[in-house]
Amino acid sequence: MAEHSPATEIRSNAERQVLFLQGPLSPLYKLTGDRLEALGFGVHRINFCAGDWLHWHGKGCVSFKRRPTEWPAFIEDYLRTHGITDLVLHGDQRLYHRVAIEKAIQQDVYVAVTELGALRPGWMTLERNGLSTLSHFPSDPVSIMRIAEAAGQVDLTPKYPSSFWLQTAPDVVYNLTNVFLKPLFPAYQRHTIYPPIQEYLRGAVRLLKEKRRNQAAEHLLASLREKAVRYYVLPLQLEGDFQLRRHSPFDSFEQVLEIVFQSLAEEAPEDVHIVLKSHPLDVGFEDWPGVSKRLADRFGVGDRVHFLDGGGLAKPFEEALGVVTLNSTAGLEALQAGLPVKTLVPAHYDIADLTHQGDLATFWHDPVYPDTDLLSAYIQALAASTQVRGSIHNAEGVVVAADNIARKVAIRDLNSFGSYVDPPPRLARARALGVPL
């Protein structure tokens, strides 16, 4: 077969028009767009707020300043009139992104969705059409084993450690820009739920108390160990997390606590306890220690519920009997630590022989441990098909991520090795549980 000349490749690429919507708070999308443009692709960007504009403006960029109700007609027309062939966006559940994906699929546009990596640190997620419950990655063990075998060994060596400043500074700059320049984009509907300035003030106070919180967490774990307490871990999730708001039937994590505490009271052995682990990015709007104490007392398990507000997950996992989670990526960490995991709604890793498929009542008494061969295959298959190397929280990592995303989009190699299953294999089960998708 004759090789394609560079000129032929450029002409072929020039027929493709790539539209970028909101990206993560980093230079990632601008860098990715630059790489695609260098390959001859037409590159477009729609900005929705001043923070978006700050990250990327100039050639190929337009601003959407109309009301959100006008977005469906706008994006439908934009896709058609500009001949868009590929759509790239970060997260699939933001209002503007949900609509754009729907309109893009209707026009046979290739949709690439990015998110922070499932195998953090040092990875980014890149999937076709949807994430989490809407992921097209298979959920049956046979297919996963087949993908892992086809992909071969993937280098999982940790790379690109996160920088505190690259996590925090871009977030602060982006959101404060939106606050002070809101008159330029008065109709913009943000996807976060907390006022940014209040969130940063609370976060600063929490950071000042971090050493004290970590010490308290160590003392609590030492006390539980000394008393030989048998406990499960329940990692809390953020109220603003789309995993809760869109990929579960719940409006608040308080409802999750009610379900778990009631089951603990009525169905678990009397010597089983729960350790709640706060989310590392929670700044305290909800007062989860107070909420959990009130609920635990209501269900009569106040002496069996403990709140851990510091440290990571590795230490509490060491002595845990297992992990109960809504659908957090912490569940995958628990599986990698060899712990049984029960998800309350379908998570990406909620797969037969990996997670406990029975109800909470059976989980308390006889939790199913993950099959180590399947877990290894799942991680290899995931890394090879829906993850790319790189990180937005590392200066070198963001460049690597841009290179890898641009390469994958250019050759349309998302969900590779046969890892695209339609319809999304987790969706029917999620809808049966009341997930609003």
Where on the chain are the PLM-derived regions?
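Donor nucleotide-activated moiety binding/catalytic core segment of transferases
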Residues: 66-80, 280, 285-330, 336
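Structural motif
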Residues: 17, 85-86, 231, 273, ...
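Catalytic core of nucleotide-activated saccharide and alditol-phosphate transferases
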Residues: 112-211
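Conserved catalytic-core segment of nucleotide-activated headgroup transferases in glycan assembly
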Residues: 39, 185-291
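Active-site and donor-binding regions of nucleotide-sugar-utilizing enzymes
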Residues: 25-31, 48-144
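N-terminal subdomain of nucleotide-sugar transferases
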Residues: 1-49
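Leloir-type glycosyltransferase catalytic cores
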Residues: 137-182, 354-437
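A donor-sugar binding/catalytic signature common to diverse glycosyltransferases
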Residues: 86-92, 96, 309-355
